[in-house]
UniProtKB/Swiss-Prot annotation:
Modified sites of kind Methionine sulfoxide: 109, 193
Described purpose of this protein according to its UniProt entry: Participates in the reverse transport of cholesterol from tissues to the liver for excretion by promoting cholesterol efflux from tissues and by acting as a cofactor for the lecithin cholesterol acyltransferase (LCAT). As part of the SPAP complex, activates spermatozoa motility.
Annotated source species: Fukomys damarensis
Protein name: Apolipoprotein A-I
Compartments in which it is found: Secreted
Lineage: Eukaryota, Metazoa, Chordata, Craniata, Vertebrata
Signal sequence region: 1-18
Gene assigned in the entry: Apoa1
TM helices/strands, residue ranges: none
Length: 264
C-alpha cells in the first residue's frame, strides 16, 4: 500500500498538476483524463463491433445459425452505456474523495515546485533574451543580403545562398551554446528537485498521515466495490435475455442439423 501511495504522489507531480505548473494552462483532473480515454475507447469498440456483427450476420454461417446478432447489438450497446454512466457517477464520487484526501500531499509538493521555479526562472529569462538577441543579430546581417537579392539579377541567387549558409550555421552554433548553458544550470535544480521529492516522500512514509491514508483508501475501495456490485449485477441481468436467445438459436440450428442427418 505504501508503494501505491508513493506512486500516486509521483503521478500528481508529473501529471496534470506539473503540466499546469509549467505550461500555466487549465489543469485537467486525472479522473477526467481517464474518463475521456475510456469513453473514446468504448465508442471505437462499439462502432467497430457493430460493423463486425453486421458482417457476421450477413455471412453464410450467420444465416445458417440464424444468429440475428445485429438485433441484439442495440440492447448490448444500451446496457454497456448504462453501465458506463452508472459507474461513472460512482467512480467520480470515489475520485473526488481520493483527491480531497490527497490535497495536502499535492499542496506540499506544489510548494516545493514553486521554490525551484523561482530559482530556475532567471535562467529561463536569460536564455530567452539571449536567443532574441541572436535572432536580431542574424536578421541584421541578413537584411543587406535580402536587398542584394531584390536589386540583383537572378544569377546572384546562388551567391546569396552561399552567403546565407555561414550565417545560418553561426546562428545554430550560438543557439546550441545557449542551450548547453541553460541545460547546465537546470541540471543542478533538477537534481535538487529530485532530492526534495525524495525527502518529502521519506517524511511522508515516516509520518502518521500515511497510516491514516491507508485506512481511508481501504474504506474508499470497499465503498466503491459495494456500490459497483449492484450495477454489475444489473448488467448481468440485462444481458441474460440476449444470451438465452443466442443459446436457443444455436440449439435449434443444431437440432435441425441432427434431424436432417438422421433422416438421410
Amino acid at each position: 500500500m505504501k508503494a501505491v501511495v508513493l506512486a500516486v504522489a509521483v503521478l500528481f507531480l508529473t501529471g496534470s498538476q506539473a503540466r499546469h505548473f509549467w505550461q500555466r494552462d487549465e489543469p485537467q483532473t486525472s479522473w477526467d483524463r481517464v474518463k475521456d480515454f475510456a469513453t473514446m475507447y468504448v465508442d471505437v469498440i462499439q462502432e467497430s463491433g457493430k460493423d463486425y456483427v453486421a458482417q457476421l450476420d450477413a455471412s453464410t454461417l450467420g444465416k445458417q445459425l440464424n444468429l440475428n446478432l445485429l438485433e441484439n447489438w442495440d440492447t448490448l450497446s444500451s446496457a454497456f452505456s448504462k453501465l458506463r454512466e452508472q459507474l461513472g457517477h460512482v467512480s467520480q464520487e470515489f475520485w473526488d474523495t481520493f483527491e480531497k484526501d490527497t490535497a495536502w500531499l499535492r499542496e506540499e509538493m506544489n510548494k516545493d515546485l514553486e521554490k525551484v521555479k523561482k530559482k530556475v526562472q532567471p535562467f529561463l529569462d536569460s536564455f530567452q533574451e539571449k536567443m532574441q538577441e541572436e535572432v536580431k543579430r542574424y536578421r541584421h546581417k541578413v537584411e543587406p543580403l535580402s536587398l542584394e537579392l531584390r536589386d540583383g539579377a537572378h544569377q546572384q541567387l546562388k551567391e546569396l545562398q552561399e552567403k546565407l549558409g555561414p550565417l545560418g550555421k553561426d546562428l545554430k552554433d550560438h543557439a546550441l551554446v545557449h542551450m548547453d548553458e541553460l541545460r547546465s544550470h537546470l541540471r543542478t535544480y533538477t537534481e535538487e528537485m529530485g532530492q526534495i521529492l525524495a525527502e518529502r516522500l521519506g517524511a511522508i512514509k515516516e509520518s502518521t498521515s500515511l497510516a491514516e491514508y491507508q485506512t481511508k483508501a481501504s474504506e474508499h475501495l470497499r465503498t466503491f466495490s459495494k456500490k459497483a456490485k449492484p450495477i454489475l449485477e444489473d448488467l448481468r441481468q440485462g444481458l441474460l435475455p440476449v444470451a438465452e436467445n443466442f443459446k436457443t438459436n444455436i440449439k435449434n440450428t443444431f437440432d435441425q442439423i441432427t434431424k436432417h442427418v438422421t433422416t438421410q
